[in-house]
Amino acid sequence: MARIAGVDLPREKKVEIGLTYIFGIGRKTAQKILEASGVSSAQRVRDLNDNDLNKLRQEIERNHRVEGALRTEVAMNIKRLMDIGSYRGTRHRRGLPVRGQRTHTNARTKKGPRRAIAGKKKVTK
């Protein structure tokens, strides 16, 4: 089983799709990595030899931030926004949508499930 950047790539998928299982690599980035390392995108992961795997590993380590390092960077960027007290940081801190979406209705994914208000009952007619 091919293991790159701490992720086991699925054996039956093509290399281009298999690389997208690594956090921080999408289809376009996978295409660029394959082109730069000289590995054919038509190959399946199970058909890669050790030389191809090493080329892919080196290309990813040298030129791309993936997995833990990328997650840390994103978390630090959000923490920085909160620390400087920007509007976006405040929205992150309160658990509300950050990019201008409405919150009067909707925004349930970000806000979480509704909470009941104690003592407030619906009036039945």
UniProtKB/Swiss-Prot annotation:
Pfam families listed in its UniProt record: Ribosomal_S13
Keyword Ribonucleoprotein: yes
Keyword list, A-Z: Ribonucleoprotein, Ribosomal protein, RNA-binding, rRNA-binding, tRNA-binding
Keyword Ribosomal protein: yes
Highest rank taxon of the organism: Bacteria
InterPro entries: Rbsml_uS13_C, Ribosomal_uS13, Ribosomal_uS13-like_H2TH, Ribosomal_uS13_bac-type, Ribosomal_uS13_CS
Free-text function comment from the UniProt entry: Located at the top of the head of the 30S subunit, it contacts several helices of the 16S rRNA. In the 70S ribosome it contacts the 23S rRNA (bridge B1a) and protein L5 of the 50S subunit (bridge B1b), connecting the 2 subunits; these bridges are implicated in subunit movement. Contacts the tRNAs in the A and P-sites.
Name of this chain's protein: Small ribosomal subunit protein uS13
Upper taxonomic lineage: Bacteria, Pseudomonadati, Gemmatimonadota, Gemmatimonadia, Gemmatimonadales
